[in-house]
């Protein structure tokens, strides 16, 4: 989230005197920029909303190994075995719905394929939303009949309006009634502004996405990059 990123950068600068230049965007936008800058690397540290995309960067040999300070205090499973991905924060995805269109909703994931929700459901684009990509991966690997459930959504008129914000906007305006794999902080931010939204987490469970912070092997400022990850 932009506010969290800005606060972290400001706090790091206050502590170390090192200025932080940021590029903020969707997971897809960040990965595209890194690819465009391969011949002339600019970034030192990358934080994504998708652990799976971080693993992809690791597999491609893009990441530097580092054992950060306070690594023993990080949640179990939030650092990979090679000390290349560090969970810096997390988001939980749930079901966001428009309370004007649907006053109350508590349907489980599979029940969102019911006829009463025909053509009312949307989901973020997983090519642009790292949180959604990890949610779908969790559905496939961690839930019984996950693939069948996703197919049932498609059969029930599921649409893909765009990245997280575009998908949420479709529900906020009432164009759609329900957003599957909605990011929690986006929902709470909109609700605080008075938008007719609510969010819940289905009874069968959901996916919590650690956001990996990673040091690039090509980091022009390697010492500062390691210091920033230590700070996180």
Please give the residue ranges for each predicted region:
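Periplasmic-binding protein-like
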Residues: 91, 150-154, 160-161, 193-217
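The catalytic Nudix box helix
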Residues: 5-18
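Short, catalytically relevant binding-site loops at active-site mouths
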Residues: 167, 184-188, 204-207
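Bilobed periplasmic-binding protein/Venus flytrap-like ligand-binding cleft at the lobe interface
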Residues: 108-116, 211-232
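A ligand-binding cleft/hinge motif common to bilobed small-molecule-binding domains
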Residues: 52-56, 177-196
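Extracytoplasmic ligand-binding site segments that recognize negatively charged/polar headgroups
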Residues: 1-6, 21, 25-31, 35, ...
């Amino acid at each position: 989230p932009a506010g969290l990123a800005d606060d972290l950068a400001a706090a790091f600068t206050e502590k170390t005197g090192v200025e932080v230049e940021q590029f903020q965007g969707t997971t897809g936008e960040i990965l595209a920029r890194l690819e465009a800058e391969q011949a002339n690397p600019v970034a030192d540290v990358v934080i994504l909303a998708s652990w799976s995309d971080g693993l992809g960067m690791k597999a491609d040999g893009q990441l530097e190994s580092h054992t950060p300070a306070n690594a023993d205090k990080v949640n179990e499973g939030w650092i990979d075995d090679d000390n290349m991905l560090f969970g810096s924060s997390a988001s939980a995805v749930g079901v966001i719905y428009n309370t004007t269109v649907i006053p109350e909703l508590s349907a489980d994931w599979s029940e969102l394929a019911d006829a009463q929700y025909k053509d009312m459901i949307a989901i973020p684009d997983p090519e642009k939303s790292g949180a959604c990509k990890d949610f779908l991966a969790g559905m496939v690997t961690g839930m019984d009949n996950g693939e069948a459930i996703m197919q049932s959504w498609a059969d029930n008129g599921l649409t893909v309006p765009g990245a997280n914000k575009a998908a949420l906007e479709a529900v906020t305006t009432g164009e759609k009634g329900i957003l599957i794999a909605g990011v929690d902080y986006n929902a709470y931010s909109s609700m605080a502004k008075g938008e007719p939204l609510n969010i819940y987490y289905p009874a069968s469970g959901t996916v919590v996405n650690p956001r990996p912070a990673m040091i690039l092997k090509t980091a022009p400022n390697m010492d500062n990059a390691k210091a920033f990850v230590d700070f996180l």
